Amino acid sequence: DAIVDADGAWTVTLEPLDAGGPYRMTVSETSEAATRESLSHDVYAGEVFICAGQSNMEYQMEFLHWRYPSEFTREADSLLRHCKVPVRFDFHGPRHEFDEPVQWVGAASDTLDEFTGIGYFFGRMIRESFGVPVGLLNITLGGSPIESWMDEETLAAWPRMLTDLAPYRNDDEARVRNESSIEARTRWHEDLRV
């Protein structure tokens, strides 16, 4: 059943599905004017794990190629899937949409570089142990302070944190600080490349 609120945000609850895939899913939207359908062909049911955190969780397989070269020559596994949530800074509240397309990709030699290393080995172990599809939702940002993962209501218990974050309410100031941070992070990633 689907539930749609006054702002158009929606939630859908599915009956339990047998682990496996790929399945096809059709989503229909009916309005006074017409009915629209959207069909997805690449849908799997199984276990989904959130891989969240800082640099240790973010550390990509790309940087582990020298240590685990055989992982990059393994047979592709479309049932071990990864989705990297793009990093976007927003100091005005939670985001409900992405600015760019986001997709799930199966583990293969041409996609493995982007997988979180910890997530990949964990997911592969679960796949081998239970034989079900595994999805890894990668929500990571190296060097991010814990406060950046907390909502404003929680941070209210530490007024100093809210004071420190106040300059970021100005979009121009936030952009300048974020660009500087991203440049430093990019340099760090370049230094890691072997």
Residue ranges, per PLM feature:
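Cell-envelope and extracellular/periplasmic
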Residues: 1-194
